[in-house]
Amino acid sequence: MYSTATQSSPSLAGVKNIVLVLSGKGGVGKSSVTTQLALTLAAQGKKVGVLDIDLTGPSIPRFFGMEDKQVYQSSAGWVPVYTDASRNLCLMSLGFLLSSRGDSVVWRGPRKTAMIRQFIRDVVWGELDYLLIDTPPGTSDEHISIAEELRFCDQILGAVIVTTPQGVALADVRKELSFCKKIGFPILGIIENMSGYVCPHCSECQNIFSKGGGENLAKQYECKFLGTVPIDPKFVLMVENAKGGLQEIYGETDMAKIFAGICDKAFSEENEEEAKETAEEEKSRAATNGQ
């Protein structure tokens, strides 16, 4: 099932930490979480890359207001799309390669695998503190492919799991936790998204789903609970109207404060060291088992 390669791609040589963002089911706001993690880390002065491997539903270009941008080929490989003049945040997505936003992607597993391999091996990421990989929901061909490509990569920091409070979403998260254990990816923590609704008029937060399921699941599986994120209509409007300027205005929002706290928990020195130790243990276990 897994690749027998023992070295990571040279294109990842300048990447310090690789983080997967996973969800058990669609519609839980995983790409929104990935976007805000990237914006928050970039605001903290980190160099961040976002790789969108949701091949049949790439949404990262739209979240960043970069749908009209294109990647181009250099002598070293594909150059990602940079969101700012300081080049602190860059993006790669199949959405940049489609001729039209409405184009559908109807690919079988082998072609998906080839595309992900090309993203990992042929993109000129340069020096990055974090590469965030936005994945499709569930455990599909894309997940298996990325696991194969990163199986022996030393920069794997771990996975952030996104869920919503509903029971059906929490049940699917258990599958993601099992997937991470099987492939040896440490869990950085669980985020409960859509935990309440923020009124755009009075800013009061009301629960429209149940609450606390993500935190309870984290306790059950002995994972870190990174926090709750409400539904904020102001952020939705901001994404719709940003036109490529999201990075400049996001820092003044209430969501930015929430994600600053989440990043402090997920990417604290203590949590990162613990994740790296877990990754080493899992790789040793895999080698012992002959995987």
Swiss-Prot record:
Gene Ontology terms: cellular component: cytosol
Binding positions (ATP): 24-31
Protein name: Cytosolic Fe-S cluster assembly factor CFD1
Species whose genome carries this gene: Yarrowia lipolytica (strain CLIB 122 / E 150)
Gene3D superfamilies the UniProt entry points to: P-loop containing nucleotide triphosphate hydrolases (3.40.50.300)
Region called Disordered, residue ranges: 270-291
UniProt function note: Component of the cytosolic iron-sulfur (Fe/S) protein assembly (CIA) machinery. Required for maturation of extramitochondrial Fe-S proteins. The NBP35-CFD1 heterotetramer forms a Fe-S scaffold complex, mediating the de novo assembly of an Fe-S cluster and its transfer to target apoproteins. Required for biogenesis and export of both ribosomal subunits, which may reflect a role in assembly of the Fe/S clusters in RLI1, a protein which performs rRNA processing and ribosome export.
Pfam families, per database record: ParA
Keyword match Iron-sulfur: yes
CDD domains hit by this protein: Mrp_NBP35 (cd02037)
Keywords assigned: 4Fe-4S, ATP-binding, Cytoplasm, Iron, Iron-sulfur, Metal-binding, Nucleotide-binding
Subcellular location, record wording: Cytoplasm
Similarity comment: Belongs to the Mrp/NBP35 ATP-binding proteins family. NUBP2/CFD1 subfamily.
Keyword Cytoplasm applies: yes
Name of the gene encoding the protein in the UniProt record: CFD1
HAMAP family assigned: Mrp_NBP35, NUBP2
